[in-house]
């Protein structure tokens, strides 16, 4: 809905854009896994959060440009999935692969977080319009960076 509201002319291309978003999810997760193997899960999670924030800023700045908006949304989705594997990797490393229960709880909480985020998005969109969703996403990305900085200092 966000892209269609900004650029109604892209409606015939939405199925291709959605395929691109799906490929971005897969690619982001794949690249994130390789980066996590190279630099460690904590640093790669921070990198993913910084990339997410940068992509949101670029979406905000280049909002009037149709194709740059689509490109940066694809980049944002890649960076969002960049951290997909790192949470489970971190739990597995900390518990020395002994806690399938914690991995299961983590998966459930990720689903709960997605449901909470979708509900929050619905409230924000109803109160102030779909354009404001970019600001909410930017604020949550910044909050994620702050939480990770505090966590990295507390648990080096």
Identify the residue ranges that each predicted region occupies.
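Short amphipathic helix-loop junctions that connect adjacent transmembrane helices
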Residues: 1-12
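Small-residue hotspots at the loop-to-helix junctions and early N-terminal turns
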Residues: 11-19, 104
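Residue-level signature of mid-helix packing/kink "hotspots" within the transmembrane helices
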Residues: 22-30, 114-115
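Helix-to-loop junctions at the C-terminal end of transmembrane segments
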Residues: 28-40, 125-126
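C-terminal transmembrane helical hairpin of 12-TM major facilitator-type secondary transporters
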Residues: 42-87
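A late C-terminal transmembrane helix in Major Facilitator Superfamily
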Residues: 94-128
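A membrane-interface helix-boundary motif in multi-pass transporters
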Residues: 123-141
């Amino acid at each position: 809905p966000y892209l269609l509201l900004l650029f109604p002319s892209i409606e015939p291309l939405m199925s291709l854009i959605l395929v691109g978003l799906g490929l971005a999810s897969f690619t982001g997760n794949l690249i994130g896994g390789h980066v996590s193997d190279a630099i460690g899960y904590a640093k790669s999670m921070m990198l993913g959060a910084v990339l997410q924030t940068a992509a949101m800023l670029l979406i905000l700045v280049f909002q009037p440009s149709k194709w740059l908006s689509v490109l940066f949304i694809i980049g944002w989705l890649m960076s969002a999935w960049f951290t997909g594997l790192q949470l489970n990797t971190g739990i597995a490393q900390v518990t020395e692969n002994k806690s399938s229960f914690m991995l299961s709880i983590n998966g459930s909480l990720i689903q709960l977080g997605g449901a909470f985020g979708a509900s929050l998005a619905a409230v924000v969109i109803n109160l102030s319009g779909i354009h404001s969703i970019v600001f909410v996403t930017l604020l949550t990305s910044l909050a994620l960076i702050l939480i990770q900085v505090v966590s990295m200092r507390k648990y080096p």
